[in-house]
Amino acid sequence: MAKPWKNPLRLYLTGRLTAELGDRRFDERRVPGRQGRRALAYLALERARPVPIDELAEAVWSTASPSGAWETALSAIVSKLRASLRGLDPLCTVTTAAGCYQLSLPHDAWVDVEAARDALDQAEGHVRAGHTKTAWGPANVAASIAARPFLAGVDAEWIARERATLRDVRVRALECLAAVALANGEHPLAAQLSREVVELEPFRETGWQRLMHALAGGGNRAEALRAYAQCEKLLADELGVTPAPETEAIAKRLRAATGGGVRRI
């Protein structure tokens, strides 16, 4: 007889920190304070390797670790995390060996930030291959996860790095979504998505290029040229550079099609 299908454990590091398995779950209210959230998130991000105790302590407290008995304090945090995780699944635990901690999850566990990166890889691969119909789903997954806050209200260098990584995932996923919308002739949607890209990363010219294509494709060449003028001014004012040849080539084609230019802003 076939074994009954089982939902995998799901660990959400974005939004409210939560772990769930079927109808069992725990969220950050059962994690030992801000330090517990930081410990679980760091161990989850680094779960492919053992994390030295002093490295985890730095991730948990940054420069403000408890004087003297920090190892005892960290051990207490990990013990509480271990108990909460085992309440979901005996295979979920934090192992200790050779002065290191390591988060151990079932082989089929789903971690949201990992899923976002995997989905982005799939989406970009589909777009590169011209398979836009199959790119939308994974791109939407990546963009949705990456738009959620990571450890809101908590700051540290490693947290800032992960937020930057998620921001990049979100921008690239939005670009994939815009590419799909363009390929499907959904120009207003492509323009909306491209505007999100340039709002998040105003110096990323691919966002401006796709915005120009979307506006022009929707019949608004003058607005597309105004987008180019905005890009040109931004780059000149902030970076002292001119747009890339690819961006200028789009503007040149638009000017030729409209029989002139657009007022600079």
Language model feature labels by segment:
Residues 127, 172-173, 177-265:
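Recognition helices and adjacent regulatory flanks at domain boundaries
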Residues 1-192, 196, 201-202, 259-265:
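Intrinsically disordered, low-complexity protein-interaction/activation regions
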